[in-house]
């Protein structure tokens, strides 16, 4: 059998692509080295932020607004346990923060619902938060967080119900191109398709070593909290920048545990076995202490944590482009630790590619040619 589309990597983007392409009537094969959702990539740990006024650059805003529409649609499949939780997101940092300036600019350009607060206003609304006098907060009322593993599980199930073929726990060992399409090799056999999407995350270089993607080991952890920090008490998800430039992110507490991670830093790695479990690097459990001590002093000790990986591009912007010399293969990689919120729209873009549809978005900023 020759498929219309083979998906290499069925985590965040691949799961979405499998669903949207199958729903469009294509004959699709999803593949993954493990059984998604799993602990080997960048999507585990239950939750991921979704922010609309984007500190990483205005070019992302059209993508994230479409992503939000798709997340809302997907959430209707899990109304008892919604995939998207509209908790709001407070972005905290010094008044001269470049990240916050980008958030404000995005909000202004796209007329997003963002409220600016000074330090006293932040602490009055959320007494659990402490910030210096020179801090501001930009509160995104319509943003919140996503249940990442539930989303992937839902997409995979919906794709399967729609007739998508799925080959999991089976790594792709080689990819070949010819005039007739794309061929992949796996331990289970050889498969062919007219087109392929490579969204293999951190270990994409195992297949395509020429790509400019650097794996980085990252950690996040859950700390002792109480009901004051919960969604029921209107405590928001957050990003926070310390005076030294370190960037943190976190979520409202659930079951008396608040999850937080540090966006910058981490350990550069070159193979999967270098991503050692949480607590095997001495700084893992204390990485969030500077932020907690200064901004959330009521949070208690570290309860547990997890390690994941970022697939960083050189400029930490996404790579969305066809493989050089092979217009039948789309790369979606280099998501650099801020990609999950876009998984829905990136999956839709991949499905459009498989149908020879022109994307509705300007993807020029994400081309590989920018690194030449």
Swiss-Prot record:
- Binding of FAD occurs at 4-34
Keywords (alphabetical) are: FAD, Flavoprotein, Oxidoreductase
* Family classification: Belongs to the MSOX/MTOX family. MTOX subfamily.
Species annotation: Escherichia coli O81 (strain ED1a)
* Top EC group: oxidoreductase
HAMAP family (alphabetical)? MTOX
Superkingdom of origin organism: Bacteria
Coiled-coil stretches are none
- Post-translational modification S-8alpha-FAD cysteine, affected residues: 308
Q: Which GO terms describe its molecular function?
A: flavin adenine dinucleotide binding; N-methyl-L-amino-acid oxidase activity; sarcosine oxidase activity
Q: How is the subunit organization of this protein annotated in UniProt?
A: Monomer.
Catalysed reaction, written as an equation:
N(alpha)-methyl-L-tryptophan + O2 + H2O = L-tryptophan + formaldehyde + H2O2
Classification via Pfam families: DAO
Report the EC number(s), separated by commas if there are several. 1.5.3.-
NCBIfam families documented for this protein: PRK11259.1
Q: What does this protein do?
A: Catalyzes the oxidative demethylation of N-methyl-L-tryptophan.
Q: Which PANTHER family did the record assign?
A: FAD DEPENDENT OXIDOREDUCTASE DOMAIN-CONTAINING PROTEIN, PEROXISOMAL SARCOSINE OXIDASE
> Could you tell me what the cofactor note in this record states?
Binds 1 FAD per subunit.
GO terms under cellular component = cytosol
* Protein's name according to its UniProt entry: N-methyl-L-tryptophan oxidase
List cofactor names only: FAD
Presence of keyword Flavoprotein: yes
């Amino acid at each position: 059998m020759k498929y219309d589309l083979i998906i290499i990597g069925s985590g965040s983007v691949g799961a979405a692509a499998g669903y949207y392409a199958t729903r469009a009537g294509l004959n699709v094969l999803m593949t993954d080295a493990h059984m998604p959702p799993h602990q080997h990539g960048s999507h585990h740990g239950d939750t991921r932020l979704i922010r609309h006024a984007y500190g990483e650059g205005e070019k992302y805003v059209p993508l994230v607004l479409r992503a939000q529409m798709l997340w809302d649609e997907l959430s209707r499949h899990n109304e008892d346990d919604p995939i998207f939780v509209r908790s709001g997101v407070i972005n905290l940092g010094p008044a001269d923060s470049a990240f916050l300036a980008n958030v404000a600019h995005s909000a202004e350009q796209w007329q997003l619902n963002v409220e600016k607060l000074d330090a006293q206003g932040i602490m009055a609304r959320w007494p659990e938060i402490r910030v210096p006098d020179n801090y501001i907060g930009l509160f995104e009322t319509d943003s919140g967080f996503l249940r990442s593993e539930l989303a992937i599980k839902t997409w995979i199930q919906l794709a399967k119900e729609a007739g998508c073929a799925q080959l999991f726990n089976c790594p792709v060992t080689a990819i070949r191109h010819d005039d007739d399409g794309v061929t992949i090799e796996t331990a289970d056999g050889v498969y062919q398709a007219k087109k392929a999407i490579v969204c293999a995350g951190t270990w994409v270089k195992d297949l395509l070593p020429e790509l400019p993607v650097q794996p980085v080991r990252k950690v996040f952890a859950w700390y002792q909290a109480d009901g004051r920090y919960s969604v029921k008490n209107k405590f928001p998800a957050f990003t926070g920048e310390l005076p030294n430039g370190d960037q943190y992110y976190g979520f409202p507490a659930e079951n008396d545990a608040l999850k937080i991670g540090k966006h910058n830093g981490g350990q550069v790695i070159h193979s999967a076995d270098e991503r050692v479990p949480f607590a095997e690097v001495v700084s893992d459990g204390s990485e969030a202490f500077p932020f907690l001590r200064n901004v959330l002093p009521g949070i208690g000790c570290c309860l547990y944590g997890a390690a994941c990986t970022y697939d960083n591009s050189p400029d930490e912007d996404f790579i969305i482009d066809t493989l050089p010399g092979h217009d039948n293969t789309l790369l979606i990689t280099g998501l650099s630790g801020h990609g999950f919120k876009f998984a829905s729209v990136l999956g839709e873009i991949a499905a459009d590619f498989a149908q020879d549809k022109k994307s509705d978005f300007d993807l020029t900023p994400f081309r590989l040619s920018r690194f030449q």
